[in-house]
């Protein structure tokens, strides 16, 4: 048999795996093979001999006193008197090891070992792929549609060598049906990795176009200042297909974060909006002062004042600004609440008209120098 260390090195190189991880799985495969061949009730151990570079597999028995009930209840123990028949020098508490050579056990044993090795190496590959893609959650990917279910509820994709899917809830539904997400087999779709699932069948990647992370990823792809870390997306909230709000921070006073994201004549923000089926994107500058943040997040409405009371923001507006503050179907006030983390309560205030006396004074001041 080829030296086990050579086999481990070969598998590690071929599968691009860490040799230490492969070694661990190979030892596990040998132990599982022993349990299949001889029974799980026995204790087995294995290690790789540094001199021969081969694996040593053995059954282990712990020496106990002749009157110890463990010897009758478990096959992992042997009485002292029986142990001395094998080795006169043993004492209670010692371990006796029986070497097992799977090669000497015939074709069935070799086939069992081969299956165990394949099973454990495939599991290792799945785990590494899972770790790799799980670390990419929130990242933008391009995926090709391979099939669509009969009711158009789920899209299926090829992503590198893995399979992905996108349920209907993860696709953008616009107020204008003509703008909503519609894909056919063969289409290339931009989305983010929302979740990575692993089971005995393999790895399945859930994609999404409705997550706020998708908007953040698109902005990073369109705006160099975000990609380079000069502008940070501090908060992001979406009502997919309708409206979104993004709060930005510039790490340098020389950078206008809103101008950087909007782009010349709106080219950058329009490109992102187009990918989001025409979703309107409000861009504001983040502030650590809650009153300022709420005021900015309520745009395009003009706010008279804001009072913060624990988790609630009391927003005072003129009646003329109420419809803008609420937004179509409540989108503006909902997004403001999502991005600021405050419950928004609107209060109308009466516009104060100048008195006749004040109006006369203002008029006189205009003509006093004539």
Where on the chain are the PLM-derived regions?
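RNA-contacting regions in translation and RNA-metabolism proteins
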Residues: 1-370
